[in-house]
């Protein structure tokens, strides 16, 4: 079946604007299109304010960080980029000293090394990067004072540096910010992932639903479609995420509702 003569399409998903009765058959001889990015797929560079309310918003899922001991002034380093021992012995940070955050909550994180293994605690309290699938032993509470961190295991013990540059988890008391052996300075190397996953994971399910519902309702409206039509725009590209196929209950942490908004776009285009 061929496309009808229209005044506007949506493609990729593709939306079609219904022409007025006065439109001629030549109205659709040339496609004039715009992209409605940042609406049903979040793009932080388009609307960064969406992320403003996230606690520890500079530590979103996927952020790359480096950790430097305040006490010995050396960086935490996974030997070989991961898969083995971890020491606090490097004067200059590079890829072996860079860890990708997996965000569990606003204060719980997992640290993934360059080769894909996670920081983990062994039975002798030594930290290594040897686990491929993170669990409780790879999950750390972060206590933060600007760029300074205390890193705590679920059992209450804190990570520290020993005098021989070992990275251990046997600091049992509450460290102060002047305690250099259990205090680390965090440098954010890359924080460029600002999509639906980071937003929903950062806010949590309840607040993320509220934020995205308001955004989807107000970012693009029927008035915008009317303006496009009046401006002789006859095609609109609306990016959608793969999780729309599972609407209204997409896998966590994604928030349902984008399919309803896409349906509205087709209705507005009639």
What would you call each of these model-derived segments?
Residues 44-45, 87, 130, 247-249:
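Generic domain-boundary/flexible-linker signal
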Residues 220-270:
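Aromatic-lined substrate-binding rim segments of carbohydrate-active enzymes
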Residues 11-63, 156, 179-235:
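N-terminal carbohydrate-binding accessory modules
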Residues 34-39, 70, 239-243:
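Active-site-proximal beta-strand/loop segments in catalytic clefts of secreted hydrolases
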Residues 57-191:
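Lectin-like carbohydrate-binding module/patch detector with strong preference for beta-trefoil
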Residues 1-11:
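Classical eukaryotic N-terminal signal peptides for Sec-dependent ER targeting/secretion
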Residues 34, 76, 119, 159, ...:
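Structural signal for hydrophobic/aromatic residues that build the beta-strand cores
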Residues 18-20, 96, 146, 264:
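Eukaryotic intrinsically disordered and solvent-exposed regulatory patches
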